[in-house]
Amino acid sequence: MPTAPLRVAVVCSSNQNRSMEAHNILSKRSFNVRSFGTGTHVKLPGPAPDKPNVYDFKTTYEQMYSDLLKKDKELYTQNGILHMLDRNRRIKPRPERFQNCKDYFDLVITCEERVYDQVVEELNSREQETCQPVHVINVDIQDNHEEATLGAFLICELCQCIQHTEDMENEIDELLQEFEDKSGRTFLHTICFY
């Protein structure tokens, strides 16, 4: 079993739904966790599919909540966006971009293949300093509230199993295979170095 707690990052596109739901569940189970997005802007559903609400990553969850409350309280209550932002603002002040974080993690879990590719590209573009390995694992999660919750519990279970391995480097492939068989999902996995 690792002596230190796993340092975990969960990454989706806008650091709103999937990564924040996993952040919430992992932090309640005492994991050392942070969450991020990889997009250039934060996008939330708007009044129509072609009219999203777009924010800068510097915008706080509180500011987004207030803005949407003013725009259309009924719509954003009904579609769950205000509830999601309320949860988010209780976890941390604002969304964060993975590309702007220079902290080291043992495990980076992404929520879709495009985000996985962006994280791997970012990590591989950095100059190696410590040669410390970081495992990047993709768990495909549809971007809706129900799937975010189911995906967060799967991510939590995966992190708990990895935390309890004797030798993460040698056991992770077998562990991921077991999770694939059990969940019916395919996980992408690679190792990058800091």
Swiss-Prot record:
EC code: 3.1.3.16
Main location: nucleus
Coiled coil feature spans: 160-186
Keyword annotations of the record: Coiled coil, Cytoplasm, Hydrolase, mRNA processing, Nucleus, Protein phosphatase
GO terms assigned for molecular function: RNA polymerase II CTD heptapeptide repeat phosphatase activity
Catalytic activity reported: O-phospho-L-seryl-[protein] + H2O = L-seryl-[protein] + phosphate; O-phospho-L-threonyl-[protein] + H2O = L-threonyl-[protein] + phosphate
GO terms, biological process: mRNA processing; termination of RNA polymerase II transcription
Key word Transmembrane helix present: no
Signal peptide: none
One Gene Ontology term, aspect cellular component: cytoplasm
Enzyme class: hydrolase
InterPro entries tied to this protein: RNA_pol_II_suA
Protein origin, superkingdom: Eukaryota
Record's subcellular location: Nucleus; Cytoplasm
Family membership noted in the UniProt record: Belongs to the SSU72 phosphatase family.
Role according to the record: May be involved in the C-terminal domain of RNA polymerase II dephosphorylation, RNA processing and termination.
Protein name (database record): RNA polymerase II subunit A C-terminal domain phosphatase SSU72
Source organism (scientific name): Xenopus laevis (African clawed frog)
